[in-house]
Every structure is written in C-alpha cells, then in structure tokens.
C-alpha cells in the first residue's frame, strides 16, 4: 500500500505530554514536540472510554509512518495536541497495518477544556 500522499498531509501540530498534576488538578505540560505532514479531520464518531462511558470525538489525526515528521513519535492516550490554538486530548490510538508493516496511525481526539 502506498503512503498517504504529502498533498493530503497539510497540517502541523504540537504534541504535549503531561508531566505533573498538582493537588488542585492543574496539569503541567512538557515543552512540546512539533509534528508536521499530518492531517486533522473533524469527527463526530462516538466511542467508549476505559470507564465504558460514551465519548464523541471532535477530530481525528492521521499520522503517516513514511511521510509524517518526526518519524520516532509514540502516541499515548491523554497526551495533548495543539492545532491552530485549539487543544485536543488523545482518547484513542489506532495503529493500522499494511500486511505486517505499520502504515499509519489514526488518533481520536476530544476538545481539551483547559486552554
């Protein structure tokens, strides 16, 4: 299967990891990592979280394993994505394979309320 075309991978975002939470619930984020050649699409998909509650996704991030940069990114649930000043929280990480080789990731995200 061919990689996702660079013509479609038109967005750049910043990926943040939570490094601590204080006793009042304020979260501290790391300096962030810029991801380029990715795609963000609006979404209305409904999923179930780890507590079996229904959650409606706000957007899906597409990360191609060949064309997206940097190439050594590891996505985890609860990381934060900043796209054009709007923050999103990762809720699902779905690796998709071409035969036995990882082709791309589809990352389900909800709006992150603590801007």
Features from the language model and the residues they span:
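Short, conserved turn/kink motifs that form compact alpha/beta structural patches or helix kinks used as
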Residues: 18-21, 26-115
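Active-site-proximal polar cores
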Residues: 1-27
């Amino acid at each position: 299967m061919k990689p996702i075309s660079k013509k479609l991978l038109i967005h750049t975002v910043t990926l943040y990891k939570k490094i601590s939470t204080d006793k009042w619930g304020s979260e501290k984020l790391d300096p962030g990592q810029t991801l380029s050649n990715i795609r963000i699409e609006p979404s209305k998909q409904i999923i179930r979280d780890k507590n079996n509650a229904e959650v409606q996704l706000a957007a899906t991030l597409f990360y191609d394993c060949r064309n997206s940069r940097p190439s050594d990114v590891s996505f985890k649930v609860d990381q934060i994505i900043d796209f054009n000043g709007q923050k999103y929280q990762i809720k699902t990480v779905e690796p998709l394979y071409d035969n036995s080789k990882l082709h791309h990731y589809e990352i389900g995200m909800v709006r992150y309320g603590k801007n």
